[in-house]
Amino acid sequence: MEPERSLKLSIWEGVLAILFLNWSTGVIVTGYALALGASPQALALLGALPFLAQLLTPLALFLRGSRKALAVRLNFLARMLFLPTALAAFLPEGLRVPTLLLFAGLSQLLAAPVGVLWLSWMADLVAEERRGRYFGFRNALLGLVGTLGNLMGGMVADRLPPPLGYQAVLLVGVGAGLLSVLLLRLQSEPSESPSPPARRALGIAWQDLAYRGYLGLVFLWYGAVMVGGPYVIPYFVQVGGLSMTEVGLWTVISASSGLLFGPMWGRMADREGHKAVLFRTAMVAALMPLLWLSGSRAFPWPVWLSAIADALAWSGLGTALANAALAHAPKEARNGYLVLFWLALGLGGLLGSLLAGSAASLGLGPSPYHFPILLSLGLRLGVALRLRRL
Protein backbone atom coordinates (compact mmCIF):
# COMPACT_ATOMS: atom_id res chain seq x y z
CA MET A 1 0.00 0.00 0.00
CA GLU A 2 1.04 3.57 -0.57
CA PRO A 3 3.17 5.30 0.47
CA GLU A 4 5.16 2.25 1.69
CA ARG A 5 5.48 0.79 -1.82
CA SER A 6 6.90 4.03 -3.19
CA LEU A 7 9.24 4.48 -0.23
CA LYS A 8 10.70 1.02 -0.86
CA LEU A 9 10.98 1.74 -4.59
CA SER A 10 12.74 4.99 -3.75
CA ILE A 11 15.45 3.04 -1.95
CA TRP A 12 16.02 0.74 -4.94
CA GLU A 13 15.95 3.71 -7.31
CA GLY A 14 18.53 5.42 -5.14
CA VAL A 15 20.77 2.33 -5.17
CA LEU A 16 21.09 2.61 -8.96
CA ALA A 17 21.17 6.39 -9.10
CA ILE A 18 23.97 6.65 -6.54
CA LEU A 19 26.30 4.62 -8.76
CA PHE A 20 25.88 7.13 -11.56
CA LEU A 21 26.11 10.11 -9.23
CA ASN A 22 29.18 8.85 -7.37
CA TRP A 23 31.09 7.87 -10.49
CA SER A 24 30.15 10.96 -12.48
CA THR A 25 30.96 13.48 -9.72
CA GLY A 26 33.38 11.75 -7.35
CA VAL A 27 36.35 9.41 -7.15
CA ILE A 28 36.11 7.85 -10.60
CA VAL A 29 35.63 11.02 -12.63
CA THR A 30 38.42 12.67 -10.60
CA GLY A 31 40.74 9.76 -11.38
CA TYR A 32 39.68 9.97 -15.02
CA ALA A 33 40.51 13.67 -15.09
CA LEU A 34 43.94 12.97 -13.56
CA ALA A 35 44.53 10.29 -16.20
CA LEU A 36 43.65 12.84 -18.89
CA GLY A 37 46.21 15.26 -17.46
CA ALA A 38 43.97 17.70 -15.56
CA SER A 39 45.74 20.55 -13.74
CA PRO A 40 44.91 21.53 -10.12
CA GLN A 41 42.81 24.38 -11.50
CA ALA A 42 40.88 21.99 -13.76
CA LEU A 43 40.32 19.67 -10.78
CA ALA A 44 38.96 22.62 -8.79
CA LEU A 45 36.58 23.44 -11.64
CA LEU A 46 35.49 19.81 -11.85
CA GLY A 47 34.74 19.89 -8.13
CA ALA A 48 32.81 23.13 -8.58
CA LEU A 49 30.46 21.77 -11.25
CA PRO A 50 27.82 20.34 -8.87
CA PHE A 51 27.68 23.68 -7.07
CA LEU A 52 27.62 25.68 -10.30
CA ALA A 53 24.64 23.58 -11.35
CA GLN A 54 22.76 24.60 -8.21
CA LEU A 55 22.53 28.12 -9.62
CA LEU A 56 19.83 26.80 -11.95
CA THR A 57 17.63 25.45 -9.16
CA PRO A 58 15.22 28.43 -9.37
CA LEU A 59 14.05 26.95 -12.68
CA ALA A 60 12.15 24.39 -10.61
CA LEU A 61 9.70 27.13 -9.61
CA PHE A 62 8.94 28.01 -13.23
CA LEU A 63 8.54 24.46 -14.56
CA ARG A 64 4.92 23.46 -14.93
CA GLY A 65 3.55 19.95 -14.62
CA SER A 66 3.96 16.92 -12.44
CA ARG A 67 7.07 16.86 -10.23
CA LYS A 68 7.45 13.18 -11.07
CA ALA A 69 7.24 13.67 -14.84
CA LEU A 70 9.69 16.57 -14.75
CA ALA A 71 12.18 14.67 -12.57
CA VAL A 72 12.01 11.63 -14.87
CA ARG A 73 12.58 13.63 -18.05
CA LEU A 74 15.36 15.80 -16.69
CA ASN A 75 17.19 12.85 -15.14
CA PHE A 76 16.95 10.87 -18.37
CA LEU A 77 18.37 13.71 -20.46
CA ALA A 78 21.10 14.45 -17.92
CA ARG A 79 22.28 10.83 -17.93
CA MET A 80 22.38 10.76 -21.71
CA LEU A 81 24.33 14.02 -21.85
CA PHE A 82 27.07 12.53 -19.69
CA LEU A 83 27.87 9.83 -22.25
CA PRO A 84 30.34 11.94 -24.32
CA THR A 85 32.63 12.34 -21.31
CA ALA A 86 33.61 8.68 -21.63
CA LEU A 87 34.77 9.37 -25.19
CA ALA A 88 36.91 12.38 -24.29
CA ALA A 89 40.05 10.21 -24.06
CA PHE A 90 39.87 9.53 -27.81
CA LEU A 91 40.17 13.23 -28.67
CA PRO A 92 43.42 15.18 -29.26
CA GLU A 93 45.23 15.82 -25.99
CA GLY A 94 44.33 19.50 -25.77
CA LEU A 95 40.59 18.79 -26.07
CA ARG A 96 40.28 15.94 -23.57
CA VAL A 97 39.92 17.81 -20.30
CA PRO A 98 37.80 20.66 -21.78
CA THR A 99 35.42 18.09 -23.30
CA LEU A 100 35.16 16.26 -19.99
CA LEU A 101 34.38 19.49 -18.17
CA LEU A 102 31.89 20.63 -20.82
CA PHE A 103 29.68 17.54 -20.92
CA ALA A 104 29.97 16.80 -17.21
CA GLY A 105 28.88 20.38 -16.59
CA LEU A 106 25.98 20.25 -19.06
CA SER A 107 24.74 17.02 -17.51
CA GLN A 108 24.74 18.52 -14.04
CA LEU A 109 23.18 21.80 -15.17
CA LEU A 110 20.29 19.94 -16.76
CA ALA A 111 19.67 17.91 -13.60
CA ALA A 112 19.88 20.94 -11.30
CA PRO A 113 16.11 21.52 -10.83
CA VAL A 114 15.59 17.86 -9.95
CA GLY A 115 16.84 18.32 -6.38
CA VAL A 116 14.01 20.73 -5.53
CA LEU A 117 11.38 18.71 -7.40
CA TRP A 118 12.44 15.39 -5.85
CA LEU A 119 12.78 16.71 -2.29
CA SER A 120 9.38 18.41 -2.48
CA TRP A 121 7.88 15.17 -3.81
CA MET A 122 9.53 13.08 -1.09
CA ALA A 123 8.45 15.51 1.63
CA ASP A 124 4.85 14.70 0.67
CA LEU A 125 5.58 10.95 0.70
CA VAL A 126 7.46 10.78 4.02
CA ALA A 127 5.60 11.87 7.14
CA GLU A 128 7.48 14.56 9.05
CA GLU A 129 7.87 12.41 12.17
CA ARG A 130 9.60 9.70 10.06
CA ARG A 131 11.95 11.85 8.01
CA GLY A 132 14.97 11.56 10.26
CA ARG A 133 14.81 7.76 10.44
CA TYR A 134 13.83 7.17 6.80
CA PHE A 135 16.40 9.47 5.24
CA GLY A 136 19.01 8.45 7.80
CA PHE A 137 18.63 4.80 6.75
CA ARG A 138 18.27 5.55 3.03
CA ASN A 139 21.29 7.83 2.92
CA ALA A 140 23.44 5.42 4.94
CA LEU A 141 22.50 2.52 2.67
CA LEU A 142 23.13 4.53 -0.48
CA GLY A 143 26.44 5.65 0.95
CA LEU A 144 27.46 2.01 1.36
CA VAL A 145 26.28 1.05 -2.13
CA GLY A 146 27.98 4.05 -3.68
CA THR A 147 31.27 3.34 -2.02
CA LEU A 148 31.17 -0.37 -2.83
CA GLY A 149 30.73 0.92 -6.36
CA ASN A 150 33.77 3.14 -5.88
CA LEU A 151 35.77 0.12 -4.70
CA MET A 152 34.76 -1.99 -7.68
CA GLY A 153 35.25 0.96 -10.01
CA GLY A 154 38.69 1.59 -8.56
CA MET A 155 39.63 -2.07 -9.05
CA VAL A 156 38.58 -1.89 -12.69
CA ALA A 157 40.49 1.38 -13.16
CA ASP A 158 43.64 -0.13 -11.61
CA ARG A 159 43.52 -3.32 -13.67
CA LEU A 160 42.89 -1.82 -17.09
CA PRO A 161 45.33 0.57 -18.75
CA PRO A 162 44.36 4.20 -18.08
CA PRO A 163 42.09 5.76 -19.05
CA LEU A 164 40.26 2.69 -20.42
CA GLY A 165 39.24 1.45 -16.97
CA TYR A 166 37.71 4.80 -16.07
CA GLN A 167 35.82 4.90 -19.35
CA ALA A 168 34.34 1.43 -18.73
CA VAL A 169 33.17 2.38 -15.24
CA LEU A 170 31.59 5.63 -16.42
CA LEU A 171 29.66 3.80 -19.14
CA VAL A 172 28.31 1.29 -16.61
CA GLY A 173 27.37 4.24 -14.40
CA VAL A 174 25.31 5.81 -17.18
CA GLY A 175 23.50 2.49 -17.64
CA ALA A 176 22.72 2.31 -13.92
CA GLY A 177 21.50 5.90 -13.99
CA LEU A 178 19.11 5.15 -16.84
CA LEU A 179 17.72 2.11 -15.01
CA SER A 180 17.12 4.29 -11.96
CA VAL A 181 14.93 6.55 -14.09
CA LEU A 182 12.70 3.55 -14.90
CA LEU A 183 12.19 2.91 -11.17
CA LEU A 184 11.51 6.59 -10.59
CA ARG A 185 8.58 6.31 -13.01
CA LEU A 186 7.00 3.55 -10.88
CA GLN A 187 6.72 5.66 -7.73
CA SER A 188 3.49 7.42 -6.86
CA GLU A 189 3.20 11.17 -6.50
CA PRO A 190 0.80 12.59 -3.88
CA SER A 191 -1.24 15.57 -4.94
CA GLU A 192 0.70 18.78 -4.50
CA SER A 193 -0.64 21.68 -2.48
CA PRO A 194 -1.33 24.75 -4.62
CA SER A 195 1.85 26.80 -4.75
CA PRO A 196 2.08 30.58 -4.95
CA PRO A 197 3.66 32.11 -8.07
CA ALA A 198 7.41 31.65 -8.29
CA ARG A 199 8.32 35.19 -7.28
CA ARG A 200 5.93 35.14 -4.35
CA ALA A 201 7.28 31.77 -3.14
CA LEU A 202 10.82 33.14 -3.23
CA GLY A 203 9.68 36.35 -1.54
CA ILE A 204 8.01 34.47 1.32
CA ALA A 205 11.17 32.46 1.91
CA TRP A 206 13.49 35.48 1.66
CA GLN A 207 11.41 37.53 4.10
CA ASP A 208 11.82 34.82 6.74
CA LEU A 209 14.71 36.38 8.69
CA ALA A 210 15.49 33.24 10.68
CA TYR A 211 15.67 31.22 7.49
CA ARG A 212 17.82 33.86 5.81
CA GLY A 213 20.31 33.54 8.66
CA TYR A 214 20.30 29.77 8.20
CA LEU A 215 20.98 30.17 4.48
CA GLY A 216 24.00 32.33 5.29
CA LEU A 217 25.46 29.50 7.34
CA VAL A 218 24.75 26.97 4.57
CA PHE A 219 26.56 29.27 2.13
CA LEU A 220 29.56 29.68 4.43
CA TRP A 221 29.71 25.98 5.27
CA TYR A 222 29.83 24.71 1.71
CA GLY A 223 32.28 27.44 0.79
CA ALA A 224 34.56 26.27 3.60
CA VAL A 225 34.20 22.61 2.62
CA MET A 226 35.00 23.19 -1.04
CA VAL A 227 38.17 25.21 -0.41
CA GLY A 228 39.80 21.84 0.25
CA GLY A 229 37.20 19.40 -1.09
CA PRO A 230 38.42 19.10 -4.71
CA TYR A 231 41.87 18.02 -3.53
CA VAL A 232 41.05 15.24 -1.07
CA ILE A 233 41.22 12.37 -3.58
CA PRO A 234 44.29 13.79 -5.40
CA TYR A 235 45.92 14.18 -1.97
CA PHE A 236 45.18 10.55 -1.08
CA VAL A 237 46.65 9.35 -4.39
CA GLN A 238 49.64 11.63 -4.88
CA VAL A 239 50.64 12.37 -1.27
CA GLY A 240 49.16 9.48 0.69
CA GLY A 241 50.23 6.93 -1.92
CA LEU A 242 46.84 5.21 -2.20
CA SER A 243 45.91 3.35 -5.36
CA MET A 244 42.43 3.78 -6.81
CA THR A 245 41.50 0.40 -5.32
CA GLU A 246 42.63 1.64 -1.91
CA VAL A 247 40.67 4.86 -2.38
CA GLY A 248 37.64 2.68 -3.10
CA LEU A 249 38.36 0.65 0.05
CA TRP A 250 38.57 3.91 2.04
CA THR A 251 35.10 4.84 0.84
CA VAL A 252 33.79 1.36 1.71
CA ILE A 253 35.07 1.74 5.28
CA SER A 254 33.38 5.13 5.47
CA ALA A 255 30.08 3.90 4.06
CA SER A 256 30.02 0.76 6.20
CA SER A 257 30.51 2.91 9.26
CA GLY A 258 27.81 5.24 7.98
CA LEU A 259 25.29 2.38 8.20
CA LEU A 260 25.81 2.52 11.96
CA PHE A 261 26.07 6.28 12.37
CA GLY A 262 23.29 7.33 9.93
CA PRO A 263 20.39 5.74 11.85
CA MET A 264 21.92 7.00 15.11
CA TRP A 265 21.84 10.59 13.83
CA GLY A 266 18.33 10.02 12.44
CA ARG A 267 17.01 8.95 15.84
CA MET A 268 18.71 11.94 17.46
CA ALA A 269 17.15 14.28 14.88
CA ASP A 270 13.66 12.88 15.51
CA ARG A 271 14.22 13.17 19.28
CA GLU A 272 16.18 16.44 19.68
CA GLY A 273 15.75 18.18 16.33
CA HIS A 274 17.96 18.56 13.29
CA LYS A 275 19.88 21.52 14.70
CA ALA A 276 21.36 19.33 17.44
CA VAL A 277 22.70 16.97 14.78
CA LEU A 278 24.03 19.86 12.70
CA PHE A 279 26.44 21.19 15.30
CA ARG A 280 27.82 17.80 16.33
CA THR A 281 28.40 16.53 12.80
CA ALA A 282 29.81 19.85 11.59
CA MET A 283 32.43 19.81 14.34
CA VAL A 284 33.58 16.35 13.27
CA ALA A 285 33.71 17.44 9.62
CA ALA A 286 35.61 20.59 10.58
CA LEU A 287 38.38 18.72 12.40
CA MET A 288 38.64 15.84 9.93
CA PRO A 289 41.24 17.53 7.63
CA LEU A 290 43.74 17.22 10.51
CA LEU A 291 43.75 13.49 9.85
CA TRP A 292 44.31 13.94 6.12
CA LEU A 293 47.22 16.31 6.64
CA SER A 294 48.81 13.94 9.17
CA GLY A 295 48.95 11.09 6.64
CA SER A 296 51.68 10.28 4.13
CA ARG A 297 53.07 7.31 2.21
CA ALA A 298 55.24 6.41 5.20
CA PHE A 299 52.51 7.10 7.79
CA PRO A 300 49.14 6.32 6.17
CA TRP A 301 47.00 5.31 9.19
CA PRO A 302 45.53 8.81 9.80
CA VAL A 303 44.14 8.73 6.25
CA TRP A 304 42.45 5.40 6.98
CA LEU A 305 41.16 6.65 10.33
CA SER A 306 39.62 9.62 8.55
CA ALA A 307 37.24 7.19 6.81
CA ILE A 308 35.53 6.64 10.18
CA ALA A 309 35.45 10.38 10.86
CA ASP A 310 34.00 10.97 7.39
CA ALA A 311 31.17 8.54 8.14
CA LEU A 312 30.52 10.02 11.56
CA ALA A 313 30.23 13.50 10.04
CA TRP A 314 28.50 13.14 6.70
CA SER A 315 26.07 10.31 7.56
CA GLY A 316 24.17 12.93 9.54
CA LEU A 317 25.26 16.32 8.26
CA GLY A 318 23.85 16.36 4.73
CA THR A 319 20.47 15.02 5.82
CA ALA A 320 20.28 17.41 8.76
CA LEU A 321 21.03 20.42 6.55
CA ALA A 322 18.20 19.55 4.14
CA ASN A 323 15.73 18.56 6.86
CA ALA A 324 16.45 21.76 8.80
CA ALA A 325 15.50 23.67 5.65
CA LEU A 326 12.27 21.65 5.36
CA ALA A 327 11.49 22.32 9.02
CA HIS A 328 11.57 26.08 8.31
CA ALA A 329 9.30 25.84 5.26
CA PRO A 330 5.51 26.18 5.34
CA LYS A 331 4.00 23.57 3.03
CA GLU A 332 2.44 26.08 0.64
CA ALA A 333 5.78 27.83 -0.02
CA ARG A 334 8.08 24.82 0.39
CA ASN A 335 9.60 25.01 -3.09
CA GLY A 336 10.65 28.62 -2.59
CA TYR A 337 12.47 27.66 0.59
CA LEU A 338 14.14 24.69 -1.09
CA VAL A 339 15.27 26.76 -4.07
CA LEU A 340 16.99 29.26 -1.78
CA PHE A 341 18.59 26.37 0.14
CA TRP A 342 20.05 24.86 -3.03
CA LEU A 343 21.15 28.29 -4.23
CA ALA A 344 22.98 28.98 -0.97
CA LEU A 345 24.61 25.55 -1.18
CA GLY A 346 25.60 26.05 -4.81
CA LEU A 347 26.93 29.58 -4.44
CA GLY A 348 28.93 28.62 -1.36
CA GLY A 349 30.43 25.57 -3.04
CA LEU A 350 31.21 27.53 -6.19
CA LEU A 351 32.97 30.30 -4.28
CA GLY A 352 34.89 27.71 -2.26
CA SER A 353 36.03 25.93 -5.41
CA LEU A 354 37.24 29.20 -6.93
CA LEU A 355 39.19 29.92 -3.75
CA ALA A 356 40.57 26.36 -3.90
CA GLY A 357 42.07 26.97 -7.33
CA SER A 358 43.60 30.25 -6.20
CA ALA A 359 44.99 28.71 -3.00
CA ALA A 360 46.54 25.80 -4.89
CA SER A 361 48.22 28.16 -7.36
CA LEU A 362 50.11 29.92 -4.54
CA GLY A 363 52.51 26.99 -4.31
CA LEU A 364 52.56 26.94 -0.50
CA GLY A 365 53.35 23.68 1.26
CA PRO A 366 54.84 20.36 0.17
CA SER A 367 52.17 19.88 -2.52
CA PRO A 368 49.53 22.04 -4.24
CA TYR A 369 46.94 20.38 -1.98
CA HIS A 370 48.27 21.02 1.55
CA PHE A 371 47.46 24.72 1.85
CA PRO A 372 43.87 24.56 0.49
CA ILE A 373 43.08 21.68 2.86
CA LEU A 374 44.57 23.53 5.83
CA LEU A 375 42.63 26.67 4.90
CA SER A 376 39.46 24.61 4.61
CA LEU A 377 40.01 23.27 8.12
CA GLY A 378 40.13 26.75 9.63
CA LEU A 379 37.09 27.98 7.72
CA ARG A 380 35.04 24.88 8.57
CA LEU A 381 35.79 25.28 12.25
CA GLY A 382 34.67 28.91 12.22
CA VAL A 383 31.32 28.05 10.60
CA ALA A 384 30.76 24.98 12.80
CA LEU A 385 31.07 27.11 15.92
CA ARG A 386 28.44 29.49 14.52
CA LEU A 387 26.06 26.57 13.89
CA ARG A 388 25.94 26.06 17.64
CA ARG A 389 23.92 29.28 17.97
CA LEU A 390 21.07 28.07 15.76
Region locations from a protein language model:
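Cytoplasmic membrane-interface "Motif A"-like loop-to-helix N-cap segments
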Residues: 65-80, 137, 162-164, 271-283, ...
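A membrane-interface helix-boundary motif in multi-pass transporters
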Residues: 155-175, 358-378
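Helix-to-loop junctions at the C-terminal end of transmembrane segments
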Residues: 56-70, 157-158, 261-274, 360
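Hydrophobic core of transmembrane alpha-helices in multi-pass small-molecule transporters
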Residues: 81, 96-114, 300-317
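Juxtamembrane intracellular "pre-TM" segments in multi-pass secondary transporters
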Residues: 1-4, 189-217
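C-terminal ends and interior cores of transmembrane alpha-helices
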Residues: 76-94, 283-298
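Helix-loop boundary and gating motifs at the non-cytosolic
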Residues: 1-56, 61, 210-251, 322
